[in-house]
Amino acid sequence: MDTINLNTILDREELINDFKSKMKNFEENKKSLNIRRGFYIYGNPGSGKSTLINNILKELNYDIINYNASDVRNKSIIETITKHNMSENNVMTMFKQNSRKICIVMDEIDGMNNGDKGGINSLIKIVRPKKTKKQKSEEYSYNPIICIGNYHIDKKIKEIKKTIDN
């Protein structure tokens, strides 16, 4: 029986390789304040964005912390990502010999609404490159933050797209 790679059929190979390259670049430069700390992935509902990203992250040896539309993603929750100095590695890996990095996935980001007050603005502050003196004093994450959404022209998403890779 022949095997067929669905990613080849869907023409995702270039996207996958590009994403892996960006993740590698992030890991090599995460201590720098001038890098973008987030990625925005978008596509039609049900097209497999979340599954694709989760599979790539597992392949790259990441533990994944997911926040989706059913979670509260307001300002205080987003700031918790950095204020409590979230480790670069999972606590469980301390007991194992192989270290696993952490990646934060904000799924259905275009679904952040009034209940998530201040969430988008806090996320922007965490992921944007720190260029000015004021920005350099802001909190940031040593973990990559991947935002997944259905739309790339959405009003709420416009500002965050300016600060992250897509």
Please provide the spans of the model-predicted regions.
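A detector of helix-start/N-cap boundary segments at the beginnings of structured domains
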Residues: 4-9, 41, 65, 166
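Active-site catalytic pocket residues across diverse enzymes, especially alpha/beta-hydrolases
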Residues: 26, 60, 127-130
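Beta-strand elements of modular eukaryotic interaction domains
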Residues: 26, 30-31, 55-56, 92-96, ...
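Pre-Walker A (pre-P-loop) alpha-helix and adjacent loop at the N terminus of AAA/AAA+ ATPase modules
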Residues: 2-37, 88-91
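Acidic, Ser/Thr-rich intrinsically disordered and amphipathic helical segments
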Residues: 14, 18-21, 51-55, 77-80, ...
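Pre-Walker A (Motif I) flank of P-loop NTPase domains
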Residues: 33-41, 100, 143
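Walker A/P-loop
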Residues: 36-67
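Non-catalytic interfacial helical region
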Residues: 68-166
